[in-house]
Amino acid sequence: MAENRCLIRLNRHTLAVTIIFKKQCADYGPRLTMQGSKHGSDGAQYAFPTWRKCLILTDACFVVFTSSSALCSMFPATAQIAAELSTTVETLHIANACVQIAMGISLFVWQPIRSFIGRRNAYLLAILTLFCFSIGAALAINASMFIAMRIIVGITGTFLLVAGQELLAETFDPVARGAAFGYMQIGNTTGLTIGPCIGGIIVSFTRWRIIYWLQVGLAGLGLILSSLFIPNEKGKSETVHGSISRLAALNPVNLLKPLVYPNIVITGSERCPEIQHILTSKQDIACGFLVFFQFIVLTSIPHIINPRFHFTTPLVSGLFYLAPGGGFVLGSLVGGIVSDRTTKRYIAKRNGIRLPQDRLNGSLPMWLGFMPVSMVIYGWTLDLEVGGMAVPIISVFFAAGGIVVAFNGLNTYTAEALPEHRFAAISGKYIIQYGFGAVSTAAVVPLIDAIGVGLVFTICAIISVIGGVGVFLVAKYGLQMQNHRFSSRV
């Protein structure tokens, strides 16, 4: 095959890149496209009217809210559950960590299911699983049964997030995609915070099992809405055929391939896997840091807030979740706007050329400013017992908002950088992400008991700065990283 040349000339406001693919790329097929392209649709499959897009977005947000609330709604009821099921609070904390580990590795289960029956059918099956095993959790007669039901419920959550992000990335144009992801993030984060509030209210007036019966109702409604509004994939076959294709679909390495490469800047077509599977491990680790922060805040609230302010009921400590919840909601709204505006600004600077990592620049103030400062204030005001209740509430509000603003750019970046392999790219992110979440969920309470809440959140602030530096390097020098890696592969 004759050599292919892709040349983008950028001087003061643009970027000079020359990529030459020689005959060695012939084995991967004749077509190669650049992700740094004009800012039109980058592989969007759907041309739905606005009202249909709104229905798809609403359903995706509601389903994500349902699955995330299933993860956290029992936090205020942990002591009551432990007492009724004859176990310990520590055992349930470890079980919560196991749920997050299951969430991370669950994509190895859902990826072949999705390949065999299609994304829409797999999506509906995941919601049905959430529905059925929430019933099992509500009817649990001992701790073992309850933990098993919790883990199976958790297995569905990550796939619903991944499939939802993949669907929104195909439905919305790049310049509106950040806002769509922001609304979906609202569903996720409000589930993580409103869920514990609802759980605290329920367990204060009735039995903890009602939490799961409410979950059953939400999952049933989500199943009905998804059956009506979630479309099939268009433009490509959803299922695999033939023995070789079926074996390939069962290969777990497909989800790990993207983690090999240092960065995404230029992606190839579906016939050039060496270039398609270029995912930033730095970005995945950054997402892991954010989930680490998120669950340190959420898991530790009953442990540090109750003794600090002498709360004695789950109702009051559950209401404290409204502070980070408000930050999550505001951050989701602001994050989408910041992400899209940053993308538009860089498109204008390059005369219409869009690179996926541009939107990461919008989250740098969160990494290097809002999050570390807020975490230090939150941790030390609780540790030193100063500032009353107002300062921790305000500081955790801003810390939570910063987490979600940073999340928006990273999530959107992952989903749009590999348009032909979105599922694998997003899945790799969640494998790492929930590994960090499991560590924070299991370790935060013993760590606070050992070194104090002030030092714990100081460590989080330091990690935030390190993560911010990594995101800055990806946003600023991602192209050079990609060119170096690509040259070594070709």
UniProtKB/Swiss-Prot annotation:
<dbReference type="GO" id="GO:0005886">
    <property type="term" value="C:plasma membrane"/>
</dbReference>
<feature type="transmembrane region" description="Helical">
    <location>
        <begin position="318"/>
        <end position="338"/>
    </location>
</feature>
<feature type="transmembrane region" description="Helical">
    <location>
        <begin position="127"/>
        <end position="147"/>
    </location>
</feature>
<feature type="transmembrane region" description="Helical">
    <location>
        <begin position="93"/>
        <end position="113"/>
    </location>
</feature>
<feature type="transmembrane region" description="Helical">
    <location>
        <begin position="186"/>
        <end position="206"/>
    </location>
</feature>
<comment type="function">
    <text>MFS-type transporter; part of the gene cluster that mediates the biosynthesis of 2,4'-dihydroxy-3'-methoxypropiophenone.</text>
</comment>
<dbReference type="GO" id="GO:0022857">
    <property type="term" value="F:transmembrane transporter activity"/>
</dbReference>
<feature type="transmembrane region" description="Helical">
    <location>
        <begin position="387"/>
        <end position="407"/>
    </location>
</feature>
<feature type="transmembrane region" description="Helical">
    <location>
        <begin position="210"/>
        <end position="230"/>
    </location>
</feature>
<feature type="transmembrane region" description="Helical">
    <location>
        <begin position="362"/>
        <end position="382"/>
    </location>
</feature>
<dbReference type="Pfam" id="PF07690">
    <property type="entry name" value="MFS_1"/>
</dbReference>
<comment type="similarity">
    <text>Belongs to the major facilitator superfamily. CAR1 family.</text>
</comment>
<feature type="transmembrane region" description="Helical">
    <location>
        <begin position="285"/>
        <end position="305"/>
    </location>
</feature>
<dbReference type="InterPro" id="IPR011701">
    <property type="entry name" value="MFS"/>
</dbReference>
<feature type="glycosylation site" description="N-linked (GlcNAc...) asparagine">
    <location>
        <position position="361"/>
    </location>
</feature>
<feature type="transmembrane region" description="Helical">
    <location>
        <begin position="151"/>
        <end position="171"/>
    </location>
</feature>
<keyword id="KW-0325">Glycoprotein</keyword>
<dbReference type="InterPro" id="IPR020846">
    <property type="entry name" value="MFS_dom"/>
</dbReference>
<dbReference type="InterPro" id="IPR036259">
    <property type="entry name" value="MFS_trans_sf"/>
</dbReference>
<feature type="transmembrane region" description="Helical">
    <location>
        <begin position="455"/>
        <end position="475"/>
    </location>
</feature>
<keyword id="KW-0813">Transport</keyword>
<keyword id="KW-0812">Transmembrane</keyword>
<keyword id="KW-1133">Transmembrane helix</keyword>
<feature type="transmembrane region" description="Helical">
    <location>
        <begin position="55"/>
        <end position="75"/>
    </location>
</feature>
<protein>
    <recommendedName>
        <fullName>MFS-type transporter ppsE</fullName>
    </recommendedName>
</protein>
<keyword id="KW-0472">Membrane</keyword>
<feature type="transmembrane region" description="Helical">
    <location>
        <begin position="434"/>
        <end position="454"/>
    </location>
</feature>
